[in-house]
Amino acid sequence: AHELLAQKDKVAAYVEDGGSLLAICGSYQLLGRSYYMGEDRIEGLGVIAAETVRGSDRLIGNVAVKTDLAPEPFVGFENHGGRTLLDADATPLGTSVVTGTGNNGDDGFEGLIYKGVIGTYLHGPALPKNPELADWLIAHALKRRDDAQATALLPLKPLNDTYEHAAHDAAMKLLP
């Protein structure tokens, strides 16, 4: 954690400049202000509007969440002991948990979107099962680059996502 905190200013500058970043589970938690483990507080990078508190048990299982980034729910597998609490002005990645627990099991949200950052508990693997998530990150990086070569690639041309959609559909079938 000390090595990461030493990079706090660099990470914050990258994020504030619109850099693209996918943070899953522990890295998502550490982008927030802090992680509380009982009475102990671990300082986070403070680049996203969130805090995490360790729960008494782990939240484990398949998860699906509605998101504004795709017509179908994003799917994954969650396995986390932390309960992430977003600030009131934060934008969740998952606006409604369909199955699973999401950030904390209480508020119905999963993950967070801030500038070019996606923070999430969607393991398993998130990008191949949710091609729109990969597309969002790529498009965001190209927009940030903002030169003729990058601009020529926007909007992204549709790819053959047959295998990705098959992986997504297989994950959906695992849901209770």
Segments the model singles out, each with a brief description of its role:
Residues 55-176:
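Amide-donor transfer/coupling interface in amidating biosynthetic enzymes
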Residues 1-71:
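Cysteine-nucleophile active-site neighborhood
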